[in-house]
Amino acid sequence: QHSPVEPELRLIPHPVLWKKESGTCDLSHGFCLPQTPPAEIQKLIHAFSSLINRYAFKDTLSSAGVTIHFENLQQKVKDEAYELEIKEESVSIRASAYNGFFYALISLLQLKESGDGIIPCGRIEDSPRFSWRGQHLDCARHYYEVDSILRLLDLMSFLKLNRFHWHLIDDEAFRLELSSVPELAARTGMRGHGCTIPGVFGGSKGPTGGTYSAEDVSRIIEHASSLGISVMPEIEIPAHSLALLKVIPEMRDPEDKSFEVSVQGYSENTIN
């Protein structure tokens, strides 16, 4: 059970354990991360610093700020667990893996931003209640630019979400560019008048859509990894396969004379 919410501790989600102590820590001038960190912390600091800079959080990272100490607990706690000890002059972060250290920094950022830089001293022990904390995005029915997806991943990281469920294939499009079957994305990535896929779900005013190259996918996966997020690409078959069958109709049994209509109004959109 999580401890009851206290007004002076504004964290989402609320930690498993919060033990308040006397005094406050002044983070109004930011906090100072190690300049020569151990190898396992270096990637973390780069990812967190980049995240801070992308959203222009003022007075967050400063050599004049409160010193942050990192301690690796060497598998003594779960990978996503962390301990945060807040003193008046310093903050200690303890964890066993990348995600734990990252979530501790996110918690510290939340506390700083919600408390105008002044946060209570105390000890936080936290670990996720759920191993899968996900966000789903349907890019088959509506195409999202890569930069929009990267921004979504950033926002997920602020809430300590760790799974990106990426829906890429459906009746309306086959978004992945495959070198083995390039015509799949080339013919179904755009929909509208005169296209292989008709104008539905916002595609009626003209061809709309797009595809994701191997480079796009690699960029998204790498960005997600730096934020402690795993990517789960979803390719939907054998149902919801209209786009696939428009390009490779032989994947449907020609002897099958059944006529089914999906909820969305598509017929003969299953592989059999």
Residue ranges of model-derived segments:
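Feature activates predominantly on carbohydrate-active enzymes
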Residues: 75-268, 272
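Acidic, contiguous N-terminal accessory segments
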Residues: 1-133
